[in-house]
Each structure stands twice: as structure tokens, then as C-alpha cells.
Design a protein with these regions (language model features):
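Conserved catalytic-core segment of NTP-binding enzymes
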Residues: 3-106
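Short N-terminal or domain-adjacent regulatory/targeting segments
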Residues: 52-56, 121-126
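Charge-biased, low-complexity intrinsically disordered regions
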Residues: 102-105, 112, 123, 127
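Hydrophobic "lid"/C-terminal helical patch
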Residues: 114, 118
Length: 130
């Protein structure tokens, strides 16, 4: 296959979600799409740790895994539709990469991220889903 999608769990900055390190090292991704929850003020289950910024997480990922973050998805928990739209716009301007909410925006936006990062890929109509 031309593209393999590997779902991850947790962030490199999370104090207990070590599986993300194994996923990044083991899969050797050419590109990563990061997910961020803008309404969270602290890391899940650790209120003493402030939620990292997408910029800091991107820096960690790109340094640790020698890869490129090509997009950002928004975890919209505790956000209104207008807050989601504002967050997408803000992060696109701040980070210089495309952003979307995969659950409330057209899913084609995720494909757009991949095709923009890899222009030599051909659009193929077959999609395998599980």
C-alpha cells in the first residue's frame, strides 16, 4: 500500500502513556497528524500537569521520531461549534499546517492533509475500512 494509517494513544509528553514512544519508533512514520484537545487545561488523569501546546508536542514528535507533523485534528470535547471553528483557524495560522475536527468537519480534510504532504500519491477510489 502507498499509505498505512497507524492510530496512536497518548502523547509523548504524557507521564504514563509510554505506548506512543513505541508506536513512533516501531512504525517509523513519514508523517504524523496530531490530535489536540484545546478545552483541556491539564493532561488526562494528571491535573498537576498543564496541557501541552500543540507547538510543544509537534517539537517533541519531530525531534523524537525524525518525522514531520502534517496536520492537526481537534478533539472538540467541551467546545461549541464556534469555538471549534476558531480553534481550527487559530492553529492553522499559528502552526502553519492544516487543522480540522474529523468528527464535525468533512473527513476529506484528512485526505487533503495527506495528499498535500505527499503530492506524488495518486488518488485511488478503493478504501479498506475495519
Amino acid at each position: 500500500p502507498d499509505v498505512i494509517i497507524i492510530e496512536g494513544q497518548g502523547a509523548l509528553s504524557h507521564p504514563t502513556y509510554l505506548s506512543s514512544t513505541a508506536i513512533l519508533r516501531g512504525s517509523l512514520p513519514t508523517a504524523v497528524i496530531l490530535q489536540h484537545a484545546p478545552a483541556r487545561t491539564a493532561i488526562s488523569d494528571f491535573p498537576m500537569f498543564a496541557m501541552p501546546t500543540p507547538a510543544s508536542e509537534i517539537n517533541l514528535i519531530e525531534t523524537f521520531a525524525d518525522t514531520k507533523v502534517i496536520g492537526l485534528t481537534i478533539n472538540h470535547e467541551n467546545m461549541t461549534a464556534s469555538e471549534i471553528t476558531a480553534a481550527i483557524t487559530m492553529y492553522e495560522l499559528e502552526l502553519g499546517i492544516p487543522a480540522t475536527d474529523a468528527l464535525t468537519r468533512p473527513t476529506g480534510r484528512l485526505l487533503d492533509m495527506v495528499f498535500a504532504a505527499f503530492p506524488d500519491l495518486e488518488v485511488k477510489p478503493s478504501i479498506v475500512a475495519t
